[in-house]
Design a protein with these regions (language model features):
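Catalytic alpha/beta active-site cores
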Residues: 2, 77-78, 82-399, 406-413, ...
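Intrinsically disordered or highly flexible coil/loop and linker segments, enriched in small
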Residues: 22-27, 42-49, 63-70, 85-89, ...
Length: 716
């Protein structure tokens, strides 16, 4: 640890900051560390006060529920109002400038990617455009009849071509006939011309859908660009490819504008427990903004180097030059107020507030983009987009706004350059969402919902009221539907339409694309102009929903409806333990134990913060700390209320450890648990998450995970 400006700084982090982060900006190392020291001195006590207020509120709520159980909504509302938890509604109107169209105007999928895996981050950044042919060919989006042939399977290819033709007929219909009849696509002064054997030549039913083209070269390669609902679709023409040869109009691919925005995550999807980990995470964010991030990997026996894609060049319909971004617009998610990091310590040995460090590093990295120091531009509007999670109520949002203002002042940035995305994932924020938005009215560019974290906080808030519903039953509760509807209602009432994102949560089954196509269209239909997906392929398939649904039109309709009743958020999701059969209890305990262990063993034992973890039935689910929080809180709640006992929990976890080990058999570096449960850091961490769940502030998992991961790293 190096002593810098009165701070003890981990050598990995110091080397990154001084050798990379500050390499081409007008900020010295002394100034950076002095700024961090001032921010820590100013905000750490305020953050500590906010966390103490959380604990005070929770203690009072616990006491009330012990006396009243779930109580009535009327009694609960009065109590929470008297407590200062439930605040008067506000009627804010946001006034935010310098917002990129990807956030303000273009509805579309949003990726969330761990910052600790540069290859994944590059994949996400480049997922602005995705191959529909690949997405259809390689997933269950199209039913598959038998095994695919090695190499290119022409039967499957024909199936993909037919599906693409049908999609084009639906979304970009011709004035007459079908895209299946096309023999050639070309541009003319009158727009798109499609040659067909049956009808001669024909144009689009709506000529305004033609956006541009790339001229056909000597080998017959070119492209046609179409647009619908703000998104673009490219018909790629290349008769020299295997697919183009098979296609009836020499089409090699249909490429969709897909992941319009991407959140580069420093929080729930990463395992960053020291300065080395933090430097890795920050390096990814910096490299994306500078445009020099690369990742090498082996593919087909060769070393492949991946880097960010360039912009895409076309000739517009009017003959002018047209440049479209080749990369997703990137936001960065910082840590919440409750987290600290040992990467930097104060003179008395205290860890600094991780969110303060994140904000400063995120903004300094943003200077490279704001000052045009890289080959590409992220924010053409001149903003840095920071998503702030785990905030409890408007006072904490106001604290973040003040922090961002202090960072701007220190770096000489215009006021409100640092925009804020508000994660609506804690109950005190949900019930006071209008007041939260009011505190950030000049910065807010995003609110979203997330079932898992929000349910985790719901469980912890009502922990002493009684045994909570099973995890699956939570999805049909009144409070959850109200939460999803009200988030949209409040945001639109505050003027988010055509200015900011209203987001919905993650599709958690990366392999279940047919199911996603069927179900996730509900998000744009609910008024969300962005929703989370687990992969670039999922982004391409989810983009179909935004091509089908006019989200701006949906938002206009929703804006005229009555705002969902806030009182319905106060219905406490508890049940009578006697209504749960022994089989129900066993299945729920086994399911959650397996989920907890499957995630924790990767986090603690392997340093993986987000991955596809098979559930008890073997279905791969995208897991991060949010999924862990709800599972650990549910089991802890049932333990407290006697639905299960400690011995049963321990026995179940021991059995499930063997199941998880078997599911991961053969994976390089996997630290098996069942052979020695007592010495397994991962197994002991999983048990601690349950047995300390009642006492852990807000039911968060980070402190337990971090401590056990640090032990595992030290022992490695």
């Amino acid at each position: 640890m190096a002593d810098t400006a009165g701070l003890q700084v981990d050598e990995h982090l110091r080397s990154f900051v001084e050798g990379e982060l500050l390499s081409d900006v007008d900020l010295t190392a002394d100034d950076f560390w002095a700024t961090l020291a001032r921010l820590q001195e100013r905000f750490a006590p305020r953050i500590a006060d906010a966390l103490a207020r959380r604990d005070e509120i929770q203690a009072r709520i616990d006491e009330w529920h012990r006396e009243h159980g779930a109580g009535s909504v009327e009694e609960y509302e009065k109590f929470l109002t008297d407590l200062g938890y439930l605040l008067p509604e506000k009627s804010p109107t946001i006034d935010v400038d310098r917002v990129d169209p990807e956030i303000a105007e273009v509805p579309g999928p949003q990726l969330v990617v761990p910052s600790t895996v540069p290859r994944y981050a590059l994949n996400a950044a480049n997922a602005r455009w995705g191959s529909l042919f690949d997405a259809f060919y390689g997933t269950d989006a199209l039913p598959q009849d038998g095994e695919l042939a090695k190499g290119y399977d022409e039967r499957r290819g024909a199936q993909v071509i037919t599906a693409a033709d049908e999609l084009l007929d639906e979304l970009f219909p011709l004035a007459k006939g079908s895209h299946a009849d096309a023999t050639a696509y070309r541009a003319s002064a009158d727009g798109l011309v499609v040659d067909t054997g049956a009808t001669g030549t024909v144009g689009l039913a709506d000529p305004a859908q033609f956006a541009g083209f790339r001229p056909v070269d000597g080998d017959g390669r070119g492209a046609v660009l179409l647009t619908r609902n703000g998104l673009h679709l490219e018909i790629t023409i290349d008769p020299t490819t295997q697919v183009g040869t098979q296609h009836h109009a020499d089409v090699a691919d249909v490429v969709l504008e897909s992941a319009v925005t991407t959140i580069v995550d420093l929080e729930d999807s990463v395992a960053t427990v020291d300065g080395e980990d933090k430097a890795l995470a920050y390096r990814t964010w910096l490299g994306l903004l500078r445009g020099d991030l690369t990742a090498e990997f082996r593919k087909g026996g060769k070393t492949v180097t991946r880097r960010v894609n360039p912009d895409r060049e076309y000739t517009a319909a009017d003959g002018s030059d047209l440049t479209l971004p080749g990369r997703s617009l990137m936001l960065v998610r910082n840590c919440g107020h409750h987290m600290t990091t040992n990467a930097v310590r104060t003179t008395d040995g205290a860890e600094v507030a991780e969110g303060v460090l994140d904000a400063l590093v995120s903004a300094v990295a943003g200077l490279y983009d704001l000052q045009g120091k890289g080959p590409h531009t992220n924010s053409r509007a001149g903003s840095v987009y920071i998503v702030k999670p785990k905030q409890h109520g408007p006072e904490e949002v106001a604290l973040t706004v003040e922090l961002f203002g202090a960072v701007e002042e220190a770096l000489g940035l215009r006021a409100n350059t640092l925009k804020i995305g508000i994660m609506d994932e804690e109950k005190r924020t949900t019930v006071n969402l209008s007041a939260c938005i009011a505190e950030a009215a000049n910065r807010v560019i995003f609110v979203n919902t997330g079932f898992l974290d929000r349910t985790g906080d719901e469980i912890h808030t009502c922990f002493t009221a009684g045994p909570v519903l099973r995890k699956g039953d939570m999805k049909s509760t009144t409070w959850l539907k109200t939460y999803e509807d009200r988030n949209v209602d409040v945001a639109l009432a505050a003027g988010f339409a055509h200015t900011a994102q209203v987001g919905k949560g993650m599709w958690a089954k990366p392999a279940a694309m047919a199911e996603m196509i069927e179900q996730k269209i509900g998000h744009p239909k609910a008024g969300a102009n962005c929703a989370w997906v687990p992969s670039p392929t999922a982004a391409t398939l989810h983009a179909l929903h935004y091509l089908r649904v006019d989200v701006h039109g949906v938002q206009d309709e929703i804006a005229s409806r009555a705002t969902a009743d806030r009182r319905k958020l106060l219905e406490v999701p508890v049940t009578d333990a006697s209504s749960l059969s022994a089989q129900d209890v066993t299945h729920e305990l086994e399911t959650n134990a397996q989920s907890i262990l499957g995630y924790v063993v990767r986090w603690v034992g392997m340093g993986i913060g987000c991955s596809t973890v098979p559930d008890l039935e073997g279905v791969g689910l995208m897991e991060d700390r949010a999924t862990l929080r709800i599972s650990a809180q549910l089991v802890a709640n049932w333990l407290q209320h006697g639905v299960v006992d400690e011995g049963t929990v321990r026995d179940t976890f021991a059995r499930m450890a063997a199941v998880v080990d078997e599911q991961n058999a053969g994976e390089d570096g996997y630290p098996a648990m069942a052979k020695d449960l007592e010495s397994s850091e991962s197994f002991q961490a999983a048990l601690e998450l349950v047995f300390s769940g009642a006492a852990e502030p807000n039911g968060y998992t980070e402190r337990t995970l971090t401590r056990w991961r640090q032990r595992a790293k030290a022992a490695a």
